[in-house]
């Protein structure tokens, strides 16, 4: 992509309305623009990141055998009345009436609707298990939306719902999804800790939240120090990880620790995923019954699995930034490489830049080629801000000798590279980052 053709409205100054780092950087880098309180338009750069995260989440769900569906944003209120949640959910639910006086709502979650779909289409234990998921925009009328997309009113979620014949099988499915979540966050290039948590208004009696460690997090987490080993060695078996202690502040009890207090550490975290074993709460209330192997009607056992995709964008920034801007993990970066031509009027600079752009694009490497006619300092500031993992910097002096500068955005290390060796180096770096995005 040529920067001269791209829509990238970067801001030089910090927006006064932004309180946290991710909100500031998302506005400054031209990822989003606010349309109303807690409601944002995603501009091209932000949308690319959102789609990259969405595709990684989708890929891992598909690998786990889940099947994608798409439920509507707008839901009939009668389903929520039937499940018993309509009056209890509170003012966060946006309700309205259509021209026929039917009460509708903008869905904040989908347990009620997916239960309705299940009960009308699956009747026998032979059709189980099933795991259905969708990726859809949701709305919660937050009383005080803040922190940009971290706590907005409109947000993109991946929600999955599993159905099993009994509790034993439901817990097996839950454990499989626990592993899927660990693998998903690995692939996203983030370090997420699974903590024991409350089920909240969803219901049920088994629950884990997944938190990205960040100083700006709202939650305090207490966890086994071995999680730090996991961060440095992501190949540790998931079964081993599942046995390690980790709890939210609400669930942490120093009098009931399975390990010594000296083996525990604490950090602030940002919740980006939550999984629940619900049991039969919705199936009983909504009469979602199946014939078991003895011909007896029994309520189906359910679990729910959510990942906040738009929230993840902000959380990843909070955990991956410096004073200059964002440092994207390679897996979610909108562009893997920023190609910076410092002098578009110098024929040698342009020759090397166009050669690099052509060679890398031929390898399906996403490159943002800065072919704009602005001063070098402005170019450096823009590309450090938007956070491509690697930068190729081409200036007249070194270009005369077929040399370019190669910068690792995360480490800040810059080295001189012969133009003929550039493609091989970048492909090697991207492979290494893919194997360990931390």
Swiss-Prot record:
The name this protein goes by in its record: Proline--tRNA ligase
Nucleotide-binding in keyword set: yes
Gene name for this UniProt entry: proS
Top class in the EC scheme: ligase
Record-linked Gene3D superfamilies: Anticodon-binding domain (3.40.50.800), Bira Bifunctional Protein, Domain 2 (3.30.930.10)
Keyword Protein biosynthesis carried by entry: yes
BP term (GO), one: prolyl-tRNA aminoacylation
Compartment list: Cytoplasm
Function: Catalyzes the attachment of proline to tRNA(Pro) in a two-step reaction: proline is first activated by ATP to form Pro-AMP and then transferred to the acceptor end of tRNA(Pro).
Catalytic activity: tRNA(Pro) + L-proline + ATP = L-prolyl-tRNA(Pro) + AMP + diphosphate
Entries under PROSITE patterns matching the protein: AA_TRNA_LIGASE_II
One Gene Ontology cellular component annotation held by this UniProt entry: cytosol
Primary localization: cytoplasm
One example GO MF annotation: ATP binding
Record keywords, A-Z: Aminoacyl-tRNA synthetase, ATP-binding, Cytoplasm, Ligase, Nucleotide-binding, Protein biosynthesis
Enzyme Commission no: 6.1.1.15
InterPro entries with a match to the protein in the record: aa-tRNA-synt_IIb, aa-tRNA-synth_II, aa-tRNA-synth_II/BPL/LPL, Anticodon-bd, Anticodon-bd_dom_sf, Pro-tRNA-ligase_IIa, Pro-tRNA-synth_IIa_bac-type, Pro-tRNA_synthetase
Subunit-level organization: Homodimer.
Family membership: Belongs to the class-II aminoacyl-tRNA synthetase family. ProS type 2 subfamily.
PANTHER family reported for this sequence: MITOCHONDRIAL RIBOSOME PROTEIN L39/PROLYL-TRNA LIGASE FAMILY MEMBER, PROLINE--TRNA LIGASE
